[in-house]
Regions:
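Rossmann-like dinucleotide/phosphate-binding beta-alpha-beta segment
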Residues: 1-44
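Rossmann-like dinucleotide-binding domain for NAD(H)/NADP(H)
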Residues: 45-47, 51-137
């Protein structure tokens, strides 16, 4: 138990949830973490949302599960191959909502990144950044 919430294993969670929102890095442990086996455990009205990294959800298995009505819907803004091939069946699947993986393209985010970068340059020239924190190529 963590913070009063019971921790359950992934298979049990998949059987119970309505929406699976993926937000994990792509590692050896998370590659194809959600494949046909896991999807087939989910409710028929379940929705998968992957906004983390392509490769976490097996795209071929997801498309098959959607075509077989194993789950109802998917929302994706990442793909195994980016940009995705134009023949990727998920691009044409009517039960998939696609959006660009572009959270940093808002005006506010771009402005904040620009200001932070400028401040880091000023800090560097004023000796406020330790040399061990500087990455050289």
């Amino acid at each position: 138990s963590l913070g009063g919430k019971k921790i359950i294993d992934l298979e049990k969670a998949l059987r119970e949830i309505d929406i699976l929102s993926m937000s994990v890095p792509l590692t050896d442990d998370t590659r194809n973490m959600i494949s046909y086996k896991q999807i087939s455990l989910m409710k028929k009205n379940a929705i998968i949302i992957n906004v983390s990294r392509g490769g976490v959800v097996n795209e071929s298995d997801l498309n098959t599960a959607l075509d077989k009505n194993i789950i109802s819907f998917a929302g994706l803004d990442v793909f195994e191959k980016e940009p995705p091939d134009t023949n990727n069946p998920l691009l044409k699947n009517k039960r998939v909502l696609l959006s660009p993986h572009a959270a940093t393209f808002t005006k506010e985010c771009l402005e904040n990144m620009s200001l932070e970068t400028a401040q880091n340059v000023i800090n560097f020239f004023n000796g406020k950044i330790e040399k061990t924190k500087i990455i050289t190529l």
